[in-house]
Regions:
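Flexible, solvent-exposed loop/hinge segments and secondary-structure transition points
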Residues: 72, 103, 157, 164-186, ...
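Small/polar-residue-rich segments within soluble enzyme cores
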Residues: 4, 21-22, 26-33, 41-146, ...
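Short beta->alpha transition motifs characteristic of CBS
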Residues: 3-13, 99-102, 191-197
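Extracytoplasmic/secreted envelope proteins and their assembly/folding machinery
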Residues: 6, 24-32, 65, 69, ...
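Conserved, well-ordered alpha-helix/loop/beta-strand core segments that scaffold catalytic motifs
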Residues: 53, 134-177
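Short, solvent-exposed cationic patches
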Residues: 9, 14-34, 116, 206-224
Length: 351
């Protein structure tokens, strides 16, 4: 995101009234036309002669500002301000966030690092003569420049990830999609994308549904993507070795009257094959082979019940209802990703 210089059009009602500014109907009509307002509405805004400052329109283009300046209406002025421009558009919209008309961050990283990205304005106290001319500088306070923020995001990976989830959303006819790409060695987040998205440079059709950073806010049951944890737990506890096999015959079993089954009878499976075939039987047997506290500690230690430390507004820590008593079936279904909800960011950090 970069700050682009723009102008604001404002009025000093007192000056307008002192100069009989309303006696120039053609100029006021021209001003109303360029601002897309009626003359009556415009003049209502400046009707109170005691007011000294009223915004007529914010963040106008240089061409519009030049046109208004040439109208030369007493009491109508231009003021410098800035507007954020987002080169990546909808690709990174939820991650980067947006600012409001006063350039204050209200979403995403813009909100999180608003103070750092804004800086501190300087000030100057002056003395003027009776005609309003500056005659003396009494006091000057230096401001602080806004800081820069460099992300670990790789824009090429970001764009590719966004393209993929948009296509997947259409293919599977889903209402939303999200993805995160993490460097497994450094932990750097290389991409964080969401769909549907929005164009942060055009605020005319923004809805909360599109603004949500689902990577960190939306929790879901992860299903089979958690199965490696059951294998890891059994290995860590010492119940199995990398060369161990698990008998999944006959492809189903009953636990407390409830059925756990695979899509077919895989028979004897290695640990690697349990993951390759996404075997419910294999992961269930591994999960039930270790003490319950050890199994649950693995889930906690992998960060599935806490936020990721990104410190972004709205981040969910997932949903997990701890129980005083667990049935074998509940532990089995937990091993293949049910009875727990996690965010995309938590799942990415786990791996």
């Amino acid at each position: 995101a970069v700050s682009v210089p723009v102008r604001a059009i404002y009025a000093d009602p007192k000056v307008i009234h002192e100069n009989d500014g309303f006696n120039e109907p053609r100029r006021w009509q021209a001003l109303a036309d360029v601002l897309g307002q009626s003359v009556d509405k415009l003049q209502d805004k400046v009707a109170n002669p005691k007011r000294r400052f009223v915004y007529l329109q914010r963040q106008v283009s240089p061409a519009m500002a030049d046109y208004v300046d040439k109208l030369d209406i007493p009491g109508i002025y231009l003021r410098r301000e800035s507007r954020r421009y987002y080169p990546t558009g909808e690709v990174s919209a939820q991650l980067i966030g947006i600012t409001d008309v006063d350039d204050t961050g209200v979403e995403g990283l813009e909100r999180m690092y608003d103070e750092w990205l804004t800086g501190t304005p300087g000030s100057r106290k002056i003395r003027r003569d009776a005609k309003g001319r500056q005659v003396e500088i009494l006091e000057t306070t230096s401001g602080e420049e806004a800081g820069n923020l460099q992300l670990t995001i790789d824009q090429r990976i970001q764009a590719l990830a966004y393209k993929e989830i948009k296509e997947a959303m259409i293919y599977y006819q889903s209402s939303s999609a999200s993805a995160i790409v993490i460097d497994v060695k450094s932990g750097d987040v290389l991409a964080m994308v969401n769909a549907p998205s929005f164009n942060p440079n055009d605020r005319s059709d923004i809805s909360p549904h599109r603004m949500r950073n689902r990577v960190i806010t939306d929790a879901f049951e992860p299903g089979s993507s958690l199965k490696p944890l059951a294998v890891l737990t059994a290995l860590e506890f010492g119940e199995v070795t990398p060369d161990s096999t698990v008998d999944t015959h006959p492809g189903w079993m009953r636990l407390g009257g409830s059925l756990v089954k695979d899509s077919r009878n895989y028979g004897e499976l290695t640990l690697e094959e349990i993951i390759q075939h996404s075997s419910n039987m294999g992961t269930s047997k591994l999960a039930l082979s270790v003490p319950k506290p050890f199994l649950l500690d693995t889930y906690y230690n992998m960060g599935l019940m806490s936020d990721t430390g990104l410190n972004m507004a709205g981040e969910s820590s997932g949903i997990f209802h701890e129980r005083s008593r667990w049935s074998e079936f509940e532990l089995a279904t937990l091993s293949f990703g049910y009875g727990i909800s996690v965010t995309t960011a938590q799942l990415g950090r786990l791996y």
